[in-house]
Curated annotation (Swiss-Prot):
This enzyme's EC code(s): 2.8.1.13
Full protein name: tRNA-specific 2-thiouridylase MnmA
Taxonomic source organism: Shewanella frigidimarina (strain NCIMB 400)
An MF annotation (GO) of this entry: tRNA binding
Major place of residence: cytoplasm
Catalytic-site annotation from UniProt: 107 (nucleophile), 205 (cysteine persulfide intermediate)
Role of this protein: Catalyzes the 2-thiolation of uridine at the wobble position (U34) of tRNA, leading to the formation of s(2)U34.
Pfam families to which the protein is assigned, alphabetical: tRNA_Me_trans, tRNA_Me_trans_C, tRNA_Me_trans_M
Disulfide-linked positions: 107-205
Site feature Interaction with tRNA, where: 133, 350
GO term, biological process aspect, one: tRNA wobble position uridine thiolation
Gene designation: mnmA
Keywords in alphabetical order: ATP-binding, Cytoplasm, Disulfide bond, Nucleotide-binding, RNA-binding, Transferase, tRNA processing, tRNA-binding
Region (Interaction with tRNA): 155-157, 317-318
Length: 372
């Protein structure tokens, strides 16, 4: 016997109110299910008061308006110090090392489901926390819980939540994970919530709408270098390897070269030793394709992970379709993964997340690529 959510029994849920439509509707749905609901707004980044890019003040205003409309308390907390130490420093260190990190995954791990949960426990006496993420939880008859993809395949966010522990999933509720996005907006509109037509947030929260290269340059000095073809010909100059990622097509500034075909150029390698960006033409160029990878910093939601030589599926980036793979343990902290078919633009530093059907098993950080 399994169920998708625990019963309320008047238990207290602290909802992470972001000022967006998903958390707004999450709070409403939990109230309808009989939970005692309160909101908690997190401030995770200390921007200048004059900063035109960060909408934290507007988000706080919207979150408060929603809580007032629903008739629930709203609390605020500042996690900027924790965010800087555990998310932003990691983000900078990874870029400095030539990798491409995903700070949203680290934010979920360290802030939204750790610092937030601790605050909800210690200060607000919570039974559960809830977020507006598009994932589901399943409660099994043996007391275990599993994290499943969201019903809306276009909005599923399990890729960003693979680092959650079994205990964190057991303490978390995800009401909108059972719905399609359009249904969430319809509920918000019927309720007259100010967030019903608010644009979804995109990009990295501490960058906002700013140009990524400009933001990064304020923290890491750029080191210009050559752009070479896969045959070794110098065809341009890059402004810094950290601004580029494997598989990147736009923003290279090397179109229309003599004696080359019209296929677009893609980044296929970053040579950190020589500070050279290597490019090749065509999205299926052999230098862009991988037949496997090694993955470390493993985390399994159910604590144990899949069995050795398991045949499951993997995503190596968000919104990528699942690819079949075979997973082999090299030791407790490292695995080798062989794909059922070649995969383009697998990127060290990004996360590989594994699935068994709809169940998110967990994942790790891509370390090295296997080609050929």
């Amino acid at each position: 016997m399994t169920s998708l959510n625990p019963t309320s029994n008047g238990k207290k849920v602290i909802v992470g109110m972001s000022g967006g439509v998903d958390s707004s509707v999450s709070a409403y749905l939990l109230m309808q299910q009989g939970f005692e609901v309160e909101g908690l707004f997190m401030k995770n980044w200390e921007e200048d008061d004059t900063d035109e890019y960060c909408a934290a003040a507007d988000d706080l205003k919207d979150a408060q308006a929603v809580c007032d409309k629903l008739g629930i308390k709203m609390h605020t907390v500042n996690f900027a110090a924790e965010y800087w130490d555990n998310v932003f420093e990691y983000f900078l260190a990874e870029y400095k090392a030539g990798r491409t990190p995903n700070p949203d995954i680290m934010c979920n791990k360290e802030i939204k489901f750790k610092a937030f949960l601790e605050f909800a426990d210690d200060i607000l006496d919570a039974d559960y926390i809830a977020m507006g993420h598009y994932v589901r939880r399943r409660d099994n008859s043996d007391g275990s819980v599993e994290m499943l993809r969201g019903v809306d395949g276009n909005k599923d966010q399990s890729y960003f939540l693979y680092t959650l522990s079994h205990e964190q999933v057991a303490r978390s509720l995800f009401p909108v994970g059972e719905l399609e996005k359009h249904q969430v907006r319809e509920i918000a509109q019927k309720l007259g919530l100010i967030t019903h037509d608010k644009k979804d947030s995109t990009g990295i929260c501490f960058i906002g709408e700013r140009k990524f290269t400009d933001f990064l340059a304020t923290y890491l000095p750029a080191q210009p270098g050559d752009i070479e073809t896969s045959e070794g010909e110098v065809i341009g100059t890059h402004q810094g390897l950290m601004y580029h990622t494997l598989g990147q097509r736009k923003g290279l500034g090397i179109g229309g070269l003599k004696n080359s075909n019209e296929d677009p150029w893609y980044v296929v390698e970053k040579d950190l030793v020589r500070n050279v960006l290597i490019v090749a033409q065509g999205g299926n160029h052999p230098r862009l394709m991988s037949t496997g990878m090694t993955v470390n910093q493993l985390h399994w939601v159910d604590r144990t992970g899949p069995a050795n030589n398991s045949t499951i599926t993997v995503k190596t980036r968000y919104r990528q379709r699942d690819v079949g793979c075979t997973l082999t343990y090299d030791d407790a902290d490292n695995i080798t993964v062989m794909f059922d078919e070649p995969v383009a633009a697998v990127t060290p530093g990004q996360s590989a997340v594994f699935y068994d059907g709809d169940i998110c098993l967990g994942g790790g950080i891509i370390d090295t690529l296997i080609r050929g």
